[in-house]
Amino acid sequence: MKFAILFGGNSYEHEISIVSAVVLKKVINQNLEFVFCDEERRFYHIPSEKMNSKTFSTKAYKNEKELFIKQGGFFSKGFLKENKLECECVINLIHGRDGEDGKIAALFEFYSIKFIGPRLEASVLSFNKELTKLYAKSVGVKTLDYTMLRKNQNSKEKLSFPCIIKPARLGSSIGISIVKDEKDLEYAKDVGFEFDNDLVVEEFKNNIKEYNLAGCMINDEFVFSIIEEPKKKEFLDFEQKYLSFSGHNELIEADLSEELKEKLKDSFKKIYNPLFKGALIRCDFFILDNEVYLNEINPNPGSLANYLFKDFNTTLNALADQISLEKMIKINYNFLHSINGQKGKL
């Protein structure tokens, strides 16, 4: 199957998305097309040989062919006709806003474009950490207790320290602060509110373990990656998260009991099915006192979490093969014709 990778977007995670696409180019062993969405949300067709950081940092991409989107795919303007970008399935690799908040999903569904990525409802629930917690609770998956802080509202909630403060609609550890006592609270809130009007506050637990599990559903069967235990300090910062997947070191599966592995997989299944069908996602979990808690859902994980899979290419192609487009409704205007044929026309 021929894929096009869509990356970039008007997002704080724009550059991360570029890194993801460059890494994935080295991983997918078949012919690829690359569609870059710049900060103005204009699409460009990037030749494979120009998929490098310089193309984007110098804005040389603007010299490439501009694309537009319409029913059935991406097109460029030719001398006499429009030329369709040849691909069978688009991989949504835009991180954060645009790619994970539902905009791209809605656009692709509206224009009947086959794609790998979260659909609209899944995007909405996974992009907002508060909604993610409510969704997890509804399907029987635990999350850590939390408090919400709203911009321009004086919260009367008494916070416990240390705590961790996160923007509700941002990933990649951007805007996150660990607050060890009250004197650091206002600064952490100011940092968070630079990125979002809503902040999630959780108690920071030193003895907690974090594990990542990626997967998808193919023909009603789950395909899982290995379970990863991230190497970290207090929490994963920007560079730990997004430079780590650009390396080539072979990962070793986390040393966990079979009971805990099954608990993680069971929680993943509850989160994934049926909302995330058509997407390859990564769930980040906490384990505390032998209990599993969902930390967050990554609906478009960095480089699609390829490094966690033993046979990523087979998984990706099998996932794409079973994705179907929404059935179009045929409009015949019979009702309007019937009105038109009567006295007192509409």
Swiss-Prot record:
Pfam families listed in its UniProt record: Dala_Dala_lig_C, Dala_Dala_lig_N
A GO BP annotation: regulation of cell shape
Function summary: Cell wall formation.
E.C. numbers: 6.3.2.4
Pathway in which the depicted protein is active: Cell wall biogenesis; peptidoglycan biosynthesis
Cofactor note: Binds 2 magnesium or manganese ions per subunit.
Name used for this protein in its record: D-alanine--D-alanine ligase
Organism: Campylobacter jejuni subsp. jejuni serotype O:6 (strain 81116 / NCTC 11828)
